[in-house]
Design a protein with these regions (language model features):
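A long, amphipathic alpha-helix that forms part
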Residues: 4, 198-220, 227-269
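Short, solvent-exposed loop/turn segments at secondary-structure junctions
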Residues: 17-20, 53-54, 69-70, 142-147, ...
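Short alpha-helical segments and helix-capping/turn motifs at coil-helix boundaries
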Residues: 21-22, 44-49, 120-129, 203-208, ...
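Short, structured active-site-proximal loop/turn typified by the sulfatase FGly-forming signature C/S-X-P-X-R
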Residues: 24-78, 137
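Short secondary-structure boundary/capping segments
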Residues: 27-30, 152-156, 235-239, 283-290
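His/Asp/Glu-rich, glycine-adjacent segments
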Residues: 67-233, 321, 339, 346
Length: 348
């Protein structure tokens, strides 16, 4: 049976860590004309809530599945995998990535997050739409799982670097998948320097324009992650520059369709964020809090001796009891310790 025509194609654009106040300022200063045009022709909702913890892997999985971490099983930026008896680190910082192993961290982020960690009991938006024969497309987004097999890119100029980092295996993703030069289902001529910050939004804009020009999707997840990296460097009140870069990526897509009016004749657009940010004025050192406990180290020479695994993740942290025979006592002691730490608002 032929697939019934869709009324409009949908573009879901996600600007990582976008602050509404900064979006308003970027528009006011004339730095975001594409976003302004979309806002003026649509509905602008400023008071949205993110998931908890509000970090990118958890929020990305929530957006892709419609579920919270208890159901989609991506619990944090850093967590302890009981089945494999090790830490999982998705790249919370360069220092953390080095501590837990660069190759391991990259492999967990690119492969395991989708193929092993993300719950199989909950379908992603790509799987739902693939099942309905709706053409899906995805740029560099953490959660890309779908039904289409993609082998690593053979055309990328970064192929040898990718192979050296163990990116040699296929994945299953959206029908059209473009992930940081590692996977590209079409020869678009677009590159992102292996997903380097500052290049990813431009890559998304380039790929998006190609997909629109060639009519290759019904649903496109248009990922714009560079605002997050810029915010960490310049502060959350310095987003105007990175919002302008995200706007240019959107403008490329609109331009290739003949302008905003022509684009909106055939496309519906949702622009959103996964979470936002605030300035960090104080920090909590969990290593000091648990100085008297035997905490599992990233490359622990004697892991069986560890009592606790401690997993900080910027806005929250998780503590795991590793000694099954003393789990109850260890959890109670950890909760008491954390309740006395200045800066810890909630222990659950």
């Amino acid at each position: 049976m032929a697939r019934p025509p869709l009324r409009k194609k949908l573009v879901l654009a996600v600007i990582d860590s976008l602050k509404p106040d900064m979006l308003d300022l970027a528009i006011e200063e004339g730095r975001a004309p594409a976003l302004e045009a979309l806002r003026d022709r649509g509905t602008y909702v400023r008071d949205c809530l993110s998931t908890f913890p509000s970090v990118t892997p958890v929020a990305s999985a929530a957006i892709a599945t419609g579920c919270g971490p208890g159901e989609h099983h991506i619990p944090s930026m850093n967590w302890y995998h009981r089945g494999e008896e090790r830490y999982v680190e998705y790249g919370s910082s360069f220092q953390a990535t080095r501590a837990f192993g660069v190759v391991r961290s990259l492999y967990d982020t690119v492969y395991n997050m989708n193929m092993a960690h993300l719950s199989r009991a909950r379908r992603t938006v790509f799987e739902h739409l693939d099942d309905a024969d709706v053409r899906t497309a995805c740029t560099t987004w953490l959660i890309y799982r779908g039904h289409t097999r993609h082998d690593p890119s053979g055309a990328s100029v970064y192929r040898r670097i990718a192979e050296a980092a163990q990116f040699r295996h296929p994945v299953y993703g959206a029908r059209e998948l473009f992930y940081a030069d590692l996977f590209d289902s079409q020869d678009t001529g677009c590159t992102s320097a292996l997903g380097m910050p500052g290049q990813r939004d431009r890559h998304t804009g380039c790929v998006g324009a190609y997909l629109v020009e060639h009519g290759l999707f019904d649903f496109l997840l248009f990922s714009l992650p560079d605002n997050d990296t810029h915010s960490h460097r310049a502060g959350p009140d310095g987003q105007v520059v990175s919002i302008a870069e995200a706007d240019r990526a959107l403008e490329r897509v609109v331009h290739v369709a003949g302008g905003v009016e022509s684009f909106l004749e055939d496309h519906t657009v949702i622009v959103m964020s996964d979470h936002s940010q605030t300035d960090v004025t104080d920090s909590v050192n969990l290593a000091e809090a648990f100085a008297e406990a035997r905490v599992l180290a990233p490359s622990d020479p004697a892991p069986v001796e560890a009592e606790l695994a401690v997993c900080p993740a910027a806005r929250s942290a998780m503590v795991y009891a590793l000694d099954e025979g003393r789990a109850g006592a260890l959890v109670d002691a950890a909760a008491d310790t954390l309740a006395e730490v200045e800066g810890v608002d909630l222990v659950a």
